[in-house]
């Protein structure tokens, strides 16, 4: 006997008066557009951190963790897309992570838990994208004008102004061409960096390689869990329901194609960057492999043209990443500020959009300039945020929706993943906080030096 239909707490009819849904999360996209959005959300300059993550794990454990994270996140995103498809077929199409979690878990509290975690992640990534883009400009400026007087916060201000302009693109769907370019840019700088690493590794100027781990057992454990948190954060996105919302209904089956496109790019970029960077620099790998290729002292270890192009590609992609992760904030603001009876470009809706999005980007830019040690803070946010949203909730939502029997293989796989990654997330958070405390004496507000 089937259960009686439940009343929908977020019925589709409400979307007619929901400006966040109608304007920001327009459902017009095809599966390849979802692939572009997913790739931009996951495949970013953070992949240049993978050799550094391998430094805390070593070769075989690094491969195991990278492969496991890839398989688990693909599985998790696939399960979440199935839950969204199931809800859509039941007449309850959800376009927001927070509403999906609250509906399936039957808890209004989950609505606020998810929105808090999403806001922390998305704002953190927005700040990080502006900071890294400012660093890219700083690197190019320092190369061209070694005695130049401009400071990092001035480059951050320049990036923020550009982001203010780009933020006026009204909807997630309107980013599809930018995110297609972002996919190509990620392939471009990966190809350049991997080529530079291989060329260096085969040359007579190759650095001495050492692949040993920390000497103490406690150091090995903390380094390993910090590396696991880094890899988990790199694979995370936390906005899959919002990306699936951009698909023209019915969205059933389209998200799987988008995931396959995204993970094809992931396979090429993640493994090639991790292997080539760690092979050449070993346990001297920096948190950004470009820093290894451009040491503070001594000659550059790759052709200037190659590094310059890679930095430009990274800079351009960071604009796309900042835009993608700001969409949830825009959707929340527009839901409250816009009028659905007026056009998307009407004066009534254009003026609030211009003011609110500009203020949001100004806040992100100010925080990036004030906190150039944000990498350490972001590691903590990643451990507390990405692991719950991307490694725990999808499995829980699937078990609650499809109710597999407790004897089934699927049930126990999902439970195992939830338990293992909850423990890994707690250990990773502890390790990240430990690193934050250890680096505290290096922190300076509005500094031109970024803490590694």
Swiss-Prot record:
Q: Which residues cross the membrane?
A: 34-54, 56-76, 113-133, 152-172, 182-202, 221-241, 261-281, 304-324, 354-374, 377-397, 409-429
Q: Which residues carry this modification: Phosphoserine?
A: 17
Q: How does it sit in the membrane?
A: Multi-pass membrane protein
Is Transport tagged as a keyword?
Answer: yes
Q: Name one GO cellular component term.
A: plasma membrane
Its localization reads: Cell membrane
GO BP annotations of the record are:
amino acid transport
> Could you tell me the keywords of this UniProt record?
Amino-acid transport, Cell membrane, Membrane, Phosphoprotein, Transmembrane, Transmembrane helix, Transport
What's one Pfam family the UniProt record gives for this protein? Aa_trans
- By its UniProt entry, which InterPro entries does this protein fall under? AA_transpt_TM (IPR013057)
| Disulfide bonding pattern of the chain | none
Main location, first listed in the record:
membrane
Give the highest taxon in the source lineage: Eukaryota
Q: What does this protein do?
A: May be involved in the transport of GABA.
What family is it from?
Belongs to the amino acid/polyamine transporter 2 family. Amino acid/auxin permease (AAAP) (TC 2.A.18.2) subfamily.
Q: What protein is this chain from?
A: Probable GABA transporter 2
Q: Which organism is it from?
A: Arabidopsis thaliana
* Taxonomic classification: Eukaryota, Viridiplantae, Streptophyta, Embryophyta, Tracheophyta
């Amino acid at each position: 006997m089937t259960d009686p239909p439940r009343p929908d707490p977020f019925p589709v009819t409400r979307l007619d008066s929901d400006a966040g849904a109608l304007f920001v999360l327009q459902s017009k996209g095809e599966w390849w557009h979802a692939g572009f959005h997913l790739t931009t959300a996951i495949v970013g300059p953070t992949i240049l951190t993978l050799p550094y993550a391998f430094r805390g794990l070593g070769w075989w454990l690094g491969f195991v963790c990278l492969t496991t994270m890839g398989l688990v996140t693909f599985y998790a995103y696939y399960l979440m897309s199935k839950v969204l498809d199931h809800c859509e077929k039941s007449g309850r199409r959800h376009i927001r992570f927070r509403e999906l979690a609250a509906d399936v878990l039957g808890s209004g509290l989950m609505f606020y838990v998810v929105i808090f975690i999403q806001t922390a992640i998305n704002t953190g990534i927005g700040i990080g994208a502006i900071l890294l883009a400012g660093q890219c400009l700083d690197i190019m400026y320092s190369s061209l004008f070694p005695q130049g007087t401009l400071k990092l916060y001035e480059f951050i201000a320049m990036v923020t102004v550009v982001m203010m302009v780009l933020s006026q693109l009204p909807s997630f769907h309107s980013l599809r061409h930018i995110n297609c370019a972002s996919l190509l840019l990620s392939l471009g700088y990966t190809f350049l960096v991997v080529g530079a690493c291989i060329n260096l590794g085969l040359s007579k100027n190759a650095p001495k390689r050492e692949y040993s781990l920390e000497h103490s057992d406690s150091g090995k454990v903390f380094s390993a869990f910090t590396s696991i948190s880094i890899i988990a954060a790199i694979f995370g996105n936390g906005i899959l329901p919002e990306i699936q919302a951009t698909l023209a209904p019915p969205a059933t089956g389209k998200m799987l194609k988008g995931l396959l496109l995204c993970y094809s790019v992931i396979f090429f970029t993640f493994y090639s960057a991790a292997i080539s960077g760690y092979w050449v620099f070993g346990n001297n790998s920096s948190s950004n492999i470009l820093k290894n290729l451009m040491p503070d002292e001594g000659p550059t270890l790759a052709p200037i043209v190659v590094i310059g192009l890679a930095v430009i590609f990274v800079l351009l992609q960071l604009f796309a990443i900042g835009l993608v992760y700001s969409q949830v904030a825009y959707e929340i603001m527009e839901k409250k500020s816009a009028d659905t009876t007026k056009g998307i470009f009407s004066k009534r809706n254009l003026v609030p959009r211009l003011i609110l999005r500009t203020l949001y980007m100004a806040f992100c830019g100010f925080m990036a300039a004030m906190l150039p040690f944000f990498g350490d803070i972001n590691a903590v946010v990643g451990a507390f945020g990405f692991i719950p949203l991307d490694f725990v909730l999808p499995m829980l939502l699937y078990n609650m929706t499809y109710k597999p029997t407790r004897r089934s293989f699927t049930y126990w796989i999902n439970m195992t993943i939830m338990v293992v990654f909850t423990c890994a997330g707690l250990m990773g958070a502890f390790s990240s906080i430990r690193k934050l405390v250890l680096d505290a004496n290096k922190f300076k507000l509005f500094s031109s030096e970024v803490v590694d």
